[in-house]
Amino acid sequence: SSTVAEHIYSTASAHGKRVQAFGAAKNQAIVMPDADLDATVNAIMGGAFGSAGERCMALPVVVAVGEDTANILIAALTPLVKALRVGPGMHKGNDENEMGPV
C-alpha cells in the first residue's frame, strides 16, 4: 500500500539509505540494464498477459532502469504484444485466440 511504502521510504531515507518505494501497484518488475533480454521478455509476457492479466500475481508495471533499457524492452515487446490474438474463447475448436477479452 502507499501508506506502507511511505513509512518504509521515510524510515530508510532518514538513515541515509537509498530507497525505491513503489507501493501503489500490486506487482512490478524492475529491469536492470544487464538483464537477460530473452528471459526478461518471456517473463514479462507471461506475467502481464497470462490469464489475461487477471490473476493475483499479474504484472501490470515494468520499471526499466535507464533509457536504453526501456527502448530495448519496447522494441522487443511491441511485436509480441501486437501478435497476441484476442477474441471469444468460448467457441469449441477455437484455437486461433490466445486470450479472451476481459
Feature map (PLM): residue ranges:
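ALDH superfamily catalytic-core signature
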Residues: 2-102
